[in-house]
Amino acid sequence: MPQNTLNTVILAAGKGTRMYSQMPKVLHCIGGKPMVERVIDTAAALNPQNICVVVGHGKEQVLDTVKRDAVWVEQTEQLGTGHAVKTALPHLASEGRTLVLYGDVPLIDVETLETLLEAAGNEVGLLTDVPADPAGLGRIIRDGSGSVTAIVEEKDASATQKTIREINTGILVLPNAKLENWLNSLSSNNAQGEYYLTDLIAKAVADGIKVRPVRVRASHLAAGVNNKRQLAELERIFQTEQAQELLKAGVTLRDPARFDLRGRLKHGQDVVIDVNVVIEGEVELGDNVEIGANCVIKNAKIGANSKIAPFSHLEGCEVGENNRIGPYARLRPQAKLADNVHVGNFVEIKNAAIGKGTKANHLTYIGDAEVGSKTNFGAGTIIANYDGVHKHKTVIGDEVRIGSNCVLVAPVTLGNKVTTGAGSTITRNIEDNKLALARARQTVIEGWMRPEKDKQ
């Protein structure tokens, strides 16, 4: 039997009633990624012959959310873990081994699974744990010589068996040559009226197949999620591990306990991240980048020596070197900033290319625009890019000076070194080196008296 023929089955059909959520349990996220997706990615790292995911409750939602290359099998009736694996049998090889994983055990890692597979060889591998509180979990039964002989679920366990602290994590390696016969012989004659996958241990022993137990090196690696408290506990463990890895790699985290990584972070040297920062998706930070407190950075690239001030939100954007962003700035998708750009408080940029050295320091909206270098936006400048049906583009040249409280009504083009007077509404193109004013002339009313309230 070729030991390198590996099939994986991921059980993800449960309702998750204790989550009190309309979302299928396995779609709840750890580190910004659905739990079942994490398990699929871990399984894929083992290079198996196939990955079979058994779904049931919320099947359509799971399939719509998780875009991974796998065989998806529906368990129409939730009749237990043994029945779930049985539904996957038509997709498993007749030779080799099957690794059984769970869509709600998100932190299982490749190292643990490789150790289990090596220990199992061509026999049965069983991942066990000795948690602080084994209540509610299946107990490992051993004979006088210490060999595993069975697993007893707590609802079926005797008072003596309940004192056993070693528990079954549910993760198994099973020989395919025996698997079908074992599954077909399962009985639902138990406290829950279900077909237990754990009953295969006793069947293996009866057939003379050795059960090779491997104790997980840390309980959280095999911990399942049944409620929001457990989800939060694993999330915090995951985030702590991510923070520790970043610290080892030279990133300065002002408070590792107040940092969330919900994706992947690529970074240079001397990166500093302040408290309550959230990193999502694919993020790249260059050398000497500083991220201020309470920022959210999602799918963004930030060049060397740039500083992001507190409470800024960057998503789907590219920031050049030596930029100064924020506080309270928002860069939306397709915002692309060259080097030495300043974006100040309450400035929003969307789908716009901003040239080198340009500044928008206060209260400005720049959308669907192409802006040259060394241009300055006065406070309160608005690019009116939407006519109610379509978005239109604005082109602004180099060294343009836009006065405070101006509105640029797209589509419109401002040439190089144009100046607009404060309070102007610009609706027509302006040639290079021109001053444009588009506002009512001030009138002072002589002899005017301010109305006063009647004192009676």
From Swiss-Prot:
Binding site for UDP-N-acetyl-alpha-D-glucosamine: 11-14, 25, 75, 80-81, 102-104, 138, 153, 168, 226, 332, 350, 365, 376
EC numbers for this chain: 2.7.7.23, 2.3.1.157
Alphabetical list of Pfam families matching this protein: Hexapep (PF00132), NTP_transf_3 (PF12804)
Region entry Linker, spans: 229-249
Record flagged with keyword Repeat: yes
List of catalytic residues: H362 (proton acceptor)
Catalytic activity: alpha-D-glucosamine 1-phosphate + acetyl-CoA = N-acetyl-alpha-D-glucosamine 1-phosphate + CoA + H(+); N-acetyl-alpha-D-glucosamine 1-phosphate + UTP + H(+) = UDP-N-acetyl-alpha-D-glucosamine + diphosphate
Enzyme class: transferase
Assembly: Homotrimer.
Major subcellular site: cytoplasm
Biological process annotations from GO: cell morphogenesis; cell wall organization; lipid A biosynthetic process; peptidoglycan biosynthetic process; regulation of cell shape; UDP-N-acetylglucosamine biosynthetic process
Record-listed acetyl-CoA binding positions: A379, N385, Y386, S404, A422, R439
Pathway as given in its UniProt record: Nucleotide-sugar biosynthesis; UDP-N-acetyl-alpha-D-glucosamine biosynthesis; N-acetyl-alpha-D-glucosamine 1-phosphate from alpha-D-glucosamine 6-phosphate (route II): step 2/2; Nucleotide-sugar biosynthesis; UDP-N-acetyl-alpha-D-glucosamine biosynthesis; UDP-N-acetyl-alpha-D-glucosamine from N-acetyl-alpha-D-glucosamine 1-phosphate: step 1/1; Bacterial outer membrane biogenesis; LPS lipid A biosynthesis
Obligatory cofactor(s): Mg(2+)
InterPro entries: Bifunctional_GlmU, GlmU-like, GlmU_C_LbH, Hexapep, MobA-like_NTP_Trfase, Nucleotide-diphossugar_trans, Trimer_LpxA-like_sf
This protein's GO CC annotations: cytoplasm; membrane
Annotated protein name in UniProt: Bifunctional protein GlmU
Cellular localization per UniProt: Cytoplasm
Region (Pyrophosphorylase): 1-228
Keywords per UniProt: Acyltransferase, Cell shape, Cell wall biogenesis/degradation, Cytoplasm, Magnesium, Metal-binding, Multifunctional enzyme, Nucleotidyltransferase, Peptidoglycan synthesis, Repeat, Transferase
Family statement: In the N-terminal section; belongs to the N-acetylglucosamine-1-phosphate uridyltransferase family. In the C-terminal section; belongs to the transferase hexapeptide repeat family.
Molecular function via GO: glucosamine-1-phosphate N-acetyltransferase activity; magnesium ion binding; UDP-N-acetylglucosamine diphosphorylase activity
Region of interest (N-acetyltransferase), residue spans: 250-456
Organism: Neisseria gonorrhoeae (strain ATCC 700825 / FA 1090)
Function of the protein: Catalyzes the last two sequential reactions in the de novo biosynthetic pathway for UDP-N-acetylglucosamine (UDP-GlcNAc). The C-terminal domain catalyzes the transfer of acetyl group from acetyl coenzyme A to glucosamine-1-phosphate (GlcN-1-P) to produce N-acetylglucosamine-1-phosphate (GlcNAc-1-P), which is converted into UDP-GlcNAc by the transfer of uridine 5-monophosphate (from uridine 5-triphosphate), a reaction catalyzed by the N-terminal domain.
Cofactor binding, per record: Binds 1 Mg(2+) ion per subunit.
Positions that bind Mg(2+): D104, N226
